[in-house]
């Protein structure tokens, strides 16, 4: 059921991330549920956008967790994770990213209980794509966003700054 996702993950396996990605592949292989569209309350797909403007990476302030994260969101039914990353980047920052992207990482993220939405704790398999910023005027952003240099970024995202000149 999740062969398309598994094949994408296999393309980014390195010695550095092999153990983590094998665990995610096994999770996808054992899942009998559609993971797009929030159908499965325990395990869902999300996608994040890594977009640089010069040496700075875009971050948003998450509306519930109140922390700086990459622009991201749930993968909708019949949507690819890449399309989600592009859509969410635009919605959350108002900026546009080119319809191209390179998968650079996949993570299993524990999402805490959300009292506001009465959403139980669950996990996301998060596909992280490097996207290129389009040179056009931004529209209205849904969320506060920040352009941060390496030294200002949350620790877990600092490893992505190696992609800034690709």
Swiss-Prot record:
Cofactor: Mg(2+)
Motif Nudix box, chain ranges: 73-94
InterPro entries for the chain: NUDIX_hydrolase-like_dom_sf, NUDIX_hydrolase_CS, NUDIX_hydrolase_dom
GO biological process, one term: one-carbon metabolic process
Residue sites binding Mg(2+) per the record: 88, 92
Xref: PROSITE patterns: NUDIX, NUDIX_BOX
Protein family per UniProt: Belongs to the Nudix hydrolase family.
Function: Probably mediates the removal of pyrophosphate from dihydroneopterin triphosphate (DHNTP), a possible step in the pterin branch of the folate synthesis pathway.
The protein's name in its UniProt record: Probable DHNTP pyrophosphohydrolase
Organism: Lactococcus lactis subsp. cremoris (strain NZ9000)
